């Protein structure tokens, strides 16, 4: 399953949550699939969608989902430590790992080798870190969103 198919699959789960989508192609794809007023497309700063989403979740009570790529997370790994230590219950970070910097020419990231973002997130103190692929992603996102609505 590619990123476009995954973003399309997630549309039934994402309802009124605020969504911050990362730079470039993912934002363009999400816009093409289903532009909504609760979507913010971070087009200008690689690595900052997770930081912006975290800031929103700290400022308001509404559920916030940041959709970030492995390349962007690798560009700003210190955000994982901040999320691990300060993220409120209304924040979800979804990392789409396609093992490449997709918006800059598909150069391979180190997740293609020995770097595990799951292990990095756990080491940074993030709770409830789930690694999944394909169709499992929507089910896991549904659970995460449902937990935040209780």
Residue ranges of predicted features:
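Thiamine diphosphate
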Residues: 3-6, 13, 32-150
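Generic structural hydrophobic/aromatic packing signal, biased to beta-strands
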Residues: 10, 19-21, 83
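Acidic-glycine-rich active-site phosphate/pyrophosphate-binding loop
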Residues: 17-35
């Amino acid at each position: 399953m590619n990123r476009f198919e995954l973003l399309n699959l997630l549309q039934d789960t994402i309802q009124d949550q605020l969504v911050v989508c990362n730079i470039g192609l993912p934002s363009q794809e999400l816009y093409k699939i289903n532009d909504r007023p609760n979507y913010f497309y971070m087009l200008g700063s690689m690595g900052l969608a997770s930081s912006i989403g975290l800031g929103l979740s700290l400022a308001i009570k509404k559920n916030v989902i940041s959709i970030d790529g492995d390349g962007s997370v690798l560009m700003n790994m210190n955000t994982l430590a901040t999320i691990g230590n300060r993220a409120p219950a209304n924040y979800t970070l979804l990392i789409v790992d396609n093992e490449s910097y997709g918006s800059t020419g598909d150069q391979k990231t180190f997740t293609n080798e020995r770097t595990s973002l799951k292990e990095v997130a756990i080491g940074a103190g993030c709770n409830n870190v789930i690694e999944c692929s394909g169709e499992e992603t929507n089910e896991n996102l549904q659970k995460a969103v449902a937990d935040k609505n209780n």
